[in-house]
From Swiss-Prot:
Catalytic activity annotation: O-phospho-L-homoserine + H2O = L-threonine + phosphate
GO CC terms of this entry: cytoplasm; nucleus
GO biological process, one term: threonine biosynthetic process
GO molecular function, one term: pyridoxal phosphate binding
Entry cofactors: pyridoxal 5'-phosphate
CDD domains: Thr-synth_2
The EC number(s) this enzyme carries: 4.2.3.1
Any further remark recorded for this protein: Present with 26000 molecules/cell in log phase SD medium.
Organism listed in the record: Saccharomyces cerevisiae (strain ATCC 204508 / S288c) (Baker's yeast)
Keyword terms: Amino-acid biosynthesis, Lyase, Phosphoprotein, Pyridoxal phosphate, Threonine biosynthesis
Family assignment from sequence similarity: Belongs to the threonine synthase family.
This protein's name: Threonine synthase
Function of the molecule: Catalyzes the gamma-elimination of phosphate from L-phosphohomoserine and the beta-addition of water to produce L-threonine.
UniProt-annotated binding residues for pyridoxal 5'-phosphate: 277-279, 281, 449
C-alpha cells in the first residue's frame, strides 16, 4: 500500500482523488490544468542524512530519495536500481554532477555545481535520461501481454527554450512505442541547441520550428494537453518541467553537492543559487529542504524576464507584455510553469489550514485569474512564507557578460574557467549575495546548468578580447563539432497556432514506423 508521499494530486483539484506515480508520469499534466504533487513530503532525520546518506554514491542516493516517492508495488527495488544505473551510465563524469570547489582564489566559499556532463551537455539530462527509461519501463510492462494491434503507444509533446528539447530527444530516441514532438521558437535558440535536436535520425523523433516565442510554444503544448479528444486519440505525454519525474530526479544533486561542500558534516551552512526560468530546478531544492536537508536559503537568479523576482518582492504574479531576448535564452519566459507547485504548498500552509482540497481551490482561482486578467495578487502571508525559503536576484545582460569575463580572468581552480550565460547569471547573483552576507562561513553552491559550448555567441562576445582565448580550442567538445556536418530533420510551423501543430503531429505520426 503506497504511503502519502507516493500518491499524487493536482494543484488545482478540490477533490480528494489521488493517482499513482505511474499515472502522474504518463499523464504529465492533470486534466484540470494543474500539476501533480505528492500531498505529503517525506521527512528524513538528521542522523540518516549525515550518518548514512552522506556516504552514498550519486546513484545510491538517487535510489534512497526516489524510493520515498515511488511505491515498492509500482517499481520494485531491483528495477528502480536498474533504471537509475542505466540513466546515469550515459554521463561523462563518474560523479554525475561534480562540484568544482573554490573556483576563484578570493572566495573560498563559492562552489560551482556542474550539471552538464550528460549526453546533451545540459542539466536537463539528469532528469530526462531517467524519464526516458521510466516511459519505456511502464510501456513495456503494460504491453507485455497485449496483442500487437492493442499495444499502447505514447506521443510525447514538449516545448523548449533550448536545452529541454535536446535532452528529451536524447532521453527518448529509439524508445519502443514512444514518439516525440518538440516545439521550439524559430531563431530563438542557439545554433548548437538546434543542431542537437534536428540531427537525431531516429524515426520516432520530430522537431517543429514554430514562428513565435517559447511562451507561444508552451501555450500550444498546454492547449494540446487540454484537448481531450486529441489527447485520448494519441495518448499524449509530457516531458517538460511540468512532469513530476523531472523534479524528483533533480533532488539528488542538492543532497549530493551539499554533502560534498560540507564533507558530510551538519555543522556547515549552505545556500544554493539557481538560474531560474520555469522554476523546476530550484523547486527540487525546495523539496530537498522540506525533506530535512538543512539548506539555509534557496536563491532564485533571474535575467531580465523577472516574474519570480517581482513576485517575491510584491506578491503580484503578473505576465509581462513581451519576452525580453537575453543572453540566457533558456530563461526567457513570461510564465514560470512550475511555480504553481510551490504556491499549492504555501496556500495549504498559510491560507487553507492544512486542507489539501481548499489549497487546490485557492490555486485554481489564482490561475483562472491569471488566464483572465494576466495577473493575480497573493496574500502577504504567502510572500512571507516564500521568503522563509527563497530570496531572489535579477541580473542584466551586461552583468552576465561581465561575469563570464571576470571568472575567466580570476579563476584559479581551474584556471580560465568558462561559464555559460545561464551559469553566469547564477554566479553574478552568488557574488552579490556573498558580498551582502555577514556570515562569511556560509558555503554557496551556484548551479551550472549548461556547457558554455552551447552558447557560442554570448561566450565569444564576453571573451573575444583575450588574446589566448579560442572557442574551438578552449570550449567546443569534439562531439559537438561534428553536429554541423549532419543532416537536419525538422518541420516549420508558419505561425503559433495549435491547429497547425496538431495537424503536423498527425501527419508525422502517420509516417512514423514505431
Amino acid at each position: 500500500m503506497p504511503n502519502a508521499s507516493q500518491v499524487y494530486r493536482s494543484t488545482r483539484s478540490s477533490s480528494p482523488k489521488t493517482i499513482s506515480f505511474e499515472e502522474a508520469i504518463i499523464q504529465g499534466l492533470a486534466t484540470d490544468g494543474g500539476l501533480f504533487i505528492p500531498p505529503t513530503i517525506p521527512q528524513v532525520d538528521q542522523a540518516t542524512l549525515f550518518n548514512d546518506w552522506s556516504k552514498l554514491s550519486f546513484q545510491d542516493l538517487a535510489f534512497a530519495i526516489m524510493r520515498l516517492y515511488i511505491a515498492q508495488e509500482e517499481i520494485p527495488d531491483a528495477d528502480l536500481k536498474d533504471l537509475i544505473k542505466r540513466s546515469y551510465s550515459t554521463f561523462r563524469s563518474d560523479e554525475v554532477t561534480p562540484l568544482v570547489q573554490n573556483v576563484t582564489g578570493d572566495k573560498e566559499n563559492l562552489h560551482i555545481l556542474e550539471l552538464f556532463h550528460g549526453p546533451t551537455y545540459a542539466f536537463k539530462d539528469v532528469a530526462l535520461q531517467f524519464v526516458g527509461n521510466l516511459f519505456e519501463y511502464f510501456l513495456q510492462r503494460t504491453n507485455a501481454n497485449l496483442p500487437e494491434g492493442e499495444k499502447k503507444q505514447i506521443t510525447v509533446v514538449g516545448a523548449t527554450s533550448g536545452d529541454t528539447g535536446s535532452a528529451a530527444i536524447y532521453g527518448l530516441r529509439g524508445k519502443k512505442d514512444v514518439s516525440v514532438f518538440i516545439l521550439y521558437p524559430t531563431g530563438r535558440i542557439s545554433p548548437i541547441q538546434e543542431e542537437q535536436m534536428t540531427t537525431v535520425p531516429d524515426e520516432n523523433v520530430q522537431t517543429l520550428s514554430v514562428t513565435g516565442t517559447f511562451d507561444n510554444c508552451q501555450d500550444i503544448v498546454k492547449a494540446i494537453f487540454g484537448d481531450k479528444e486529441f489527447n485520448s486519440k494519441h495518448n499524449v505525454g509530457a516531458v517538460n518541467s511540468i512532469n513530476w519525474a523531472r523534479i524528483l530526479a533533480q533532488m539528488t544533486y542538492y543532497f549530493y553537492s551539499f554533502f560534498q561542500a560540507t564533507n558530510g558534516k551538519d555543522s556547515k551552512k549552505v545556500k544554493f543559487v539557481v538560474p531560474s526560468g520555469n522554476f523546476g530546478d530550484i523547486l527540487a531544492g525546495y523539496f530537498a529542504k522540506k525533506m530535512g536537508l538543512p539548506i539555509e536559503k534557496l536563491a532564485i537568479a533571474t535575467n531580465e524576464n523577472d516574474i519570480l523576482d517581482r513576485f517575491l518582492k510584491s506578491g503580484l504574479y503578473e505576465r509581462s507584455d513581451k519576452v525580453a531576448a537575453t543572453l540566457s535564452p533558456a530563461m526567457d519566459i513570461l510564465i514560470s510553469s512550475n511555480f504553481e507547485r510551490l504556491l499549492w504548498y504555501l496556500a495549504r500552509e498559510y491560507l487553507a489550514n492544512g486542507d489539501d482540497l481548499k489549497a487546490g481551490e485557492i490555486v485554481n482561482n489564482w490561475f483562472q485569474e491569471l488566464k483572465t486578467n494576466g495577473k493575480f495578487q497573493v496574500d502577504k502571508s504567502i510572500i512571507e512564507g516564500a521568503s522563509k525559503d527563497f530570496t531572489s536576484e535579477r541580473v542584466s545582460n551586461e552583468e552576465t557578460s561581465e561575469t563570464i569575463k571576470k571568472i575567466y580572468e580570476s579563476s584559479v581552480n581551474p584556471k580560465h574557467y568558462i561559464l555559460d550565460p545561464h551559469t553566469a547569471v547564477g554566479v553574478c547573483a552568488t557574488e552579490r549575495l556573498i558580498a551582502k552576507d555577514n556570515d562569511k562561513s556560509i558555503q554557496y553552491i551556484s548551479l551550472s546548468t549548461a556547457h558554455p559550448a552551447k552558447f557560442a555567441d554570448a561566450v565569444n562576445n564576453a571573451l573575444s578580447g583575450f588574446s589566448n582565448y579560442s572557442f574551438e580550442k578552449d570550449v567546443l567538445p569534439e562531439e559537438l563539432k561534428k553536429l554541423s556536418t549532419l543532416k537536419k530533420k525538422l518541420k516549420f510551423i508558419e505561425r503559433a497556432d495549435v491547429e497547425l501543430v496538431k495537424n503536423a503531429i498527425e501527419e508525422e505520426l502517420a509516417k512514423m514506423k514505431l
